[in-house]
UniProtKB/Swiss-Prot annotation:
Keyword flag Cytoplasm: yes
An MF annotation (GO) of this entry: ribosomal large subunit binding
InterPro entries from the UniProt entry: Ribosome_recyc_fac, Ribosome_recyc_fac_dom, RRF_sf
ATP-binding as UniProt keyword: no
Superkingdom of source: Bacteria
Predominant location: cytoplasm
Species per Swiss-Prot/TrEMBL record: Crocosphaera subtropica (strain ATCC 51142 / BH68) (Cyanothece sp. (strain ATCC 51142))
Record-linked HAMAP family: RRF
Gene3D superfamilies in the cross-refs: 3.30.1360.40, Ribosome-recycling factor
Record protein name field: Ribosome-recycling factor
Segments of this protein annotated with the region Disordered: 136-157
Length: 182
């Protein structure tokens, strides 16, 4: 039972790391880079994807079609204020974001950012492992389980931890390849 909870929590950490990776801009248009952009809309911070249809008509363009044309100014301002690093082009109907090709230096910076995100994911997994091992030791101390059972569980916990750490390494390798592909 405990290992299932452990796997579930570690899987959530892997998924959170994947979502973080999705916000990193590569050389290709990807609407998910706008996931963290919020727009002040009638006094409320609202996620951009709730205010507009976001599409990628080609590999270097993101097109934003607001449901309410009156919000175009706020959307444009929100994109400029965000960390996306793109300049919006507003033609009155849609807002276009042209994705410039990444420089070698920018690619290296993005790889460092991805590595940092991966490390944060691994830290979260190690924290889950630490909590699980603490629980096992507490059970052993309270004589709920034997020393051998405790060692076996701790070994199982470490194996699960290694599996999920490897998953994050695989995601990182794929993201690095994606970033460095010209």
């Amino acid at each position: 039972m405990m290992l299932d909870d452990l796997k579930e929590n570690m899987q959530k950490s892997v998924e959170a790391t994947q979502r973080s990776f999705n916000t990193i801009r590569t050389g290709r248009a990807n609407a998910s880079i706008l996931d963290r952009v919020t727009v002040e809309y009638y006094g409320t911070e609202t996620p951009l994807y709730q205010l507009a249809n976001i599409s990628t008509p080609d590999a270097t363009t993101i097109m934003i079609q607001p449901y309410d044309k009156g919000s175009m100014g706020q959307i444009e301002k929100a994109i400029q204020m965000s960390d996306v690093g793109l300049t919006p082009n507003n033609d009155g109907q849609v807002i276009r974001l042209n994705i410039p090709p990444l420089t070698e230096e920018r690619r290296k910076d993005l790889v460092k950012l991805a590595s940092k995100m991966a490390e944060e994911g691994k830290v979260a997994i190690r924290n889950i492992r630490r909590d699980a091992i603490d629980d096992v030791r507490k059970q052993e101390k309270n004589s709920d389980i034997s020393e051998d059972e405790s060692r076996g569980l701790q070994d199982d916990i470490q194996k699960v931890t290694d599996q999920f750490t490897d998953k994050i390494d695989e995601l990182l390798a794929a993201k690095e390849k994606d970033i460095m592909t010209v």
